[in-house]
Structures are given as C-alpha cells and as structure tokens.
Amino acid sequence: MSTVAPAGALPSYSDVLARYEPVIGLETHVELGTASKMFCGCATAFGAEPNTQVCPVCLGLPGSLPVVNEAAVRFAVMIGLALHCEIASWCRFARKNYFYPDMPKNFQISQYDEPLCTNGWLDVEVEGEVHRVGITRVHMEEDTGKSLHVGGATGRIHGATHSLVDYNRAGIPLVEIVTEPDVRSPEVARAYVDELRELIRALGVSDVRMEQGSLRCDANVSLRPRPAPGDPDAPFGTRSETKNLNSLRSVERAVRYETTRQAALLDDGQRIIQETRHFDEASGRTSSGRSKEEATDYRYFPEPDLTPLALPAEYVERLRAGLPELPAARRARLIAEHGYTARDLQDLRNAAVLDLVEETIAAGAAPATARKWWLNELARRASDAGLQPRDLKITPTDVARITALVAAGELTDALARKVIDGVLAGEGTPDEVIAGRGLAIVADDSALTAAVDAALLGAPDIAEKVRGGKVNAVGPLVGAVMKAMKGQADAAAVRRLLLERLGVS
C-alpha cells in the first residue's frame, strides 16, 4: 500500500477542513539541564568532542549499574506541577527494548505503565481563543546517542556511504510530555509547543533550544470525517507520526502537510499506513520512515537494576511552593501593571527582550519607552551583530538612564542612539559617553538663536512661504538648524522657535 499522495496537486487546506477534522497529538522530548546524565556521572555539555562524555554505565558495558539523578527527578516533578499534573507517590522505570546503533545497551531506560506525572493540561491562545490541551503523561527517560550519516547529500541514512555514532548524548536526562489528541489545527500545535517551551524556560530546568535538539517534537496526525452535529465521538483515523521536528515553523508546516497528504489518499480510496515520517524543511513535505511499532513490540518490563521511586508528599509540596511565576500569570500581571497588550508581549517575547524590558522598568523606565528602545532599537542591533539581546554590552540600568535623559529633554532620540553607540563600544556609562562625546542638548539659548537666524537668512524664499501660511514648508529650516547644532537640539523646540520668529502661530 502506497503512502505517497496521488499525483497532482494536493487539495487545499481549506477544502480539506470542509470535509475532514484533523486530530493531532504531540509528543515532546525535553533534555533536562542537569550537570550529569540520568543514570551516571558523565557530563552533559553540548558540543563536546564525540565520545568524550561516556562511561561504562551510559555505554551499557557488562557489570555497570545505573543510579538515578535526583536533580532530574526534581526537574521532572516541577514540569509536571507546572502542567497541572497529578504527581505519582510511587512510580518506576522500565526497559524499552529495541536495537539501533545509537542505543548502546540495546534498551532504553524509560517509564511505561507507571509514569511520574499524569492527567494535566496546558492552555494556549490562538487569535484570541483559548484552547486547552490535555496532558496524558510526563515521564522520565534517557536520551539516545546521535548517528551521523556521511557521504550523502541529505545527511540522512539513505544515500550515505557510512555512519558514525556519538554517544555523548546517550543517557542525558529527558522528559517526554505526551498530549491527549486534543489539537485540531497546525496553528494550535505550534502555539502549544511555543507555550510549553516558554513554561519550561521559566522553570529554569532546560534551555529548550530546538535548534540544538534540547526540545524535539513528534506530531501524530490523523483525519476523520468531520463529525456530524451532536456526534463529537466519531472514531479517529489511522495516524502517522512525524518525528523530530526542531522548530515551531516545522511543527506547523509538517502538521499542515500531513493533513493534506492524508486527505488526498483518502479521497483516492487508499488507506493511511500507521508509520513514522520525516519532514524535509526545504520542500515542506514528509516522507515515509518505517512502520510504527505498538507498545508490545518494545517488550517493556520493569527495570531490574533500579528500585521504584517513592516521592513523599512533603517533597512534592515543597517543589510546588517553590515554582517561579509561570508565563500565563506573568502575562496577566504585565498587562494589568504596565498596560501592555497581548500582542505587545508576544512581540517582546519573539524578540527575546521581555526579561530585559521588565528589568529596565524595574530600573526606573516607563513601560512604553522600555518597550520602544529594546524592541525597536536594541533587538535590531543584536540581530545585526548575530547576538542575543542579553549579550549586548548594555544593561537595563543603562537603558533606563538613557530613557530618563530623553524624557527630561536632555537628549533627543538621535542623540540617545549615539549614546547607545558609545556604551556598546565600551566607552563607559551613558553619562560618561555623553561627557566624552559632547552629546548633551546645547542649553545655550544664544547659540540656538544664532543658528535660527542663520537658517532664516540662508533660505529667505522658504521663510516667505512659511510666513504666507505654508507651515509644513518649515522642515528644511528645521533641518538646517539641527545641522548647525550638530543634532544637539530638540527638533520640536527648534520648529516652535522658527515659527515664532516668522510670526506664525
């Protein structure tokens, strides 16, 4: 049975939605930011030389025994609590048996029928509508190694001449977060992963960098005929699982493509094969991987080398009490306290400056000006330099000082940008840069008056037009004064003075 969509263009997504309902469930793997691996003391640093962070335990050598990493358990409980899950007072690990080169033990220590966290939820908002996504379970496991396929054009095993394996990643602590099949659109799928990423980042338990693989998403997609009114429980169709999506854009595009691919097969009278699939970012299409296993294929059984985990209620409640402010609560607070809109906060988050803006406000800046300077000026500079905004050599306190000087009329926006230039160049604090570069607005009224007089004498025709009522013609005169003052004047004040001298109210 073919898994390739029929020849010709796929149906439009809107046409598919008129006839079918997408049913989407997401499995998200999150690498926990512990200093050592899940069951041994090996380091977890990203980017180390291949096979330099390994030991007999994570290589599965005979006689080695695992020991549970307490920090990983703590981080997993925190994630479960933040997702409103029930935390098991007793759970245990299981062996998931399969053979693959990147799995040195030929089994993975995971959890099966007795996971750590169950029955949670996460609310996500798309275009003003809140969607609640149920969380089936959050369980702990160890990551696999990483296969590197050499000699092909795509970096995949097909077409490669040989493969290499790096076991540095083998044994790194993971949590797998599995949703209910509650998602009904690519947009909600993307929003869920985005919100989950922000929540985990707020907890401080992972850097959730999708481009480095510390957050990876598998999307399970099936279609069913659009349910008739009053029949919400129509059976689901056969699902495919698109593996290892490593960006928000890929999550949305892969789900959308799978929806249209499956619709084309069903329309052609074919059936959907339960299989894993791979998403190609360049083409925006998925391709067949392998048939999808059932749980029985993995021959799960309790891990004999680890005792069950029994978590005291006091331990869980202590972690609950210590949770930081979570993204939804933070958004509500910032909207209430500072007058931001939900779109403002999304823009700040997308630019990676939300924390910096809040720190700038705490240093004394007005919310609107803090947002303006970080979003419109500093985020752009960071992007141009290939940096994260946090890595710029300017602090929230510096930005608050600059905005205060602008508000007091001691700097114009143009001068403020020059001050930022100096701070970023390492010339000192904003006040030191102003003194060193001579950037303050000139307070000498006689100098400004002389510049105004010179501008009027130099352009009598423009002056006459303004006197005649063409007030907007004053622009070139303002420019001439600002040039003479080397930008160290308030343009609005210059305009007022020119109009006064020309007798125009």
Curated annotation (Swiss-Prot):
Provide the family line.
Belongs to the GatB/GatE family. GatB subfamily.
Query: PROSITE patterns, from UniProt?
Result: GATB (PS01234)
Name of the protein this chain belongs to: Aspartyl/glutamyl-tRNA(Asn/Gln) amidotransferase subunit B
Q: Which organism is it from?
A: Frankia casuarinae (strain DSM 45818 / CECT 9043 / HFP020203 / CcI3)
Question: Per its database record, what is this protein's job?
Answer: Allows the formation of correctly charged Asn-tRNA(Asn) or Gln-tRNA(Gln) through the transamidation of misacylated Asp-tRNA(Asn) or Glu-tRNA(Gln) in organisms which lack either or both of asparaginyl-tRNA or glutaminyl-tRNA synthetases. The reaction takes place in the presence of glutamine and ATP through an activated phospho-Asp-tRNA(Asn) or phospho-Glu-tRNA(Gln).
Annotated SMART domains: GatB_Yqey (SM00845)
Q: Which PANTHER family match?
A: GLUTAMYL-TRNA GLN AMIDOTRANSFERASE SUBUNIT B MITOCHONDRIAL AND PROKARYOTIC PET112-RELATED, GLUTAMYL-TRNA(GLN) AMIDOTRANSFERASE SUBUNIT B, MITOCHONDRIAL
Write down a Pfam family by its short name: GatB_Yqey
Return the EC number.
Answer: 6.3.5.-
List the molecular function annotations (GO) for this entry: asparaginyl-tRNA synthase (glutamine-hydrolyzing) activity; ATP binding; glutaminyl-tRNA synthase (glutamine-hydrolyzing) activity
Q: Assembly and partners? A: Heterotrimer of A, B and C subunits.
Keywords for the protein's UniProt record, in alphabetical order: ATP-binding, Ligase, Nucleotide-binding, Protein biosynthesis
* InterPro entries according to UniProt: Asn/Gln-tRNA_amidoTrfase_suB/E, Asn/Gln-tRNA_Trfase_suB/E_cat, Asn/Gln_amidotransferase, Asn/Gln_tRNA_amidoTrase-B-like, GatB, GatB_Yqey_C_2, Gln-tRNA_amidoTrfase_suB_CS, Gln_synth/guanido_kin_cat_dom
Q: Which NCBIfam families match?
A: gatB, PRK05477.1-2, PRK05477.1-3, PRK05477.1-4
UniProt xrefs under Gene3D superfamilies: 1.10.10.410
* Residue ranges, annotated region (Disordered): 220-241
- Which biological process terms from the Gene Ontology are attached to this UniProt entry? glutaminyl-tRNAGln biosynthesis via transamidation; translation
Q: Which reaction does it catalyse?
A: L-glutamyl-tRNA(Gln) + L-glutamine + ATP + H2O = L-glutaminyl-tRNA(Gln) + L-glutamate + ADP + phosphate + H(+); L-aspartyl-tRNA(Asn) + L-glutamine + ATP + H2O = L-asparaginyl-tRNA(Asn) + L-glutamate + ADP + phosphate + 2 H(+)
